Amino acid sequence: MEYQYPMDVDWTTEEKIAVISFFQAVEKAYEKGIPKQELLDTYKRFKEIVPSKAEEKTHCAAFEKESGYSPYRTVKTAREAEESTIIRM
């Protein structure tokens, strides 16, 4: 797919990489599956960078609009899944 990840110009390179890693984990859940803990670990790091719920919604909505993949539904599914589960959307 050809699209851009939502970014904030004030983020460091390391923070941008972490945010991209989270969005790539969401992509992986849709495309082939990802271990629950791997997805939740990338989400935890994403939340360290984007602690505001409003800002999270803005970035996730932009990503969903570009890709068609829902970070919200993916994380919700992972949280509700049993341990050692592969998350597939």
Swiss-Prot record:
Family matches, as Gene3D superfamilies: BH2638-like
Coiled coil: none
Pfam families: UPF0223
InterPro entries assigned to the protein according to its UniProt record, in alphabetical order: BH2638-like_sf, UPF0223
Domain of life per record: Bacteria
Family: Belongs to the UPF0223 family.
Protein name: UPF0223 protein BPUM_1362
Organism this protein belongs to: Bacillus pumilus (strain SAFR-032)
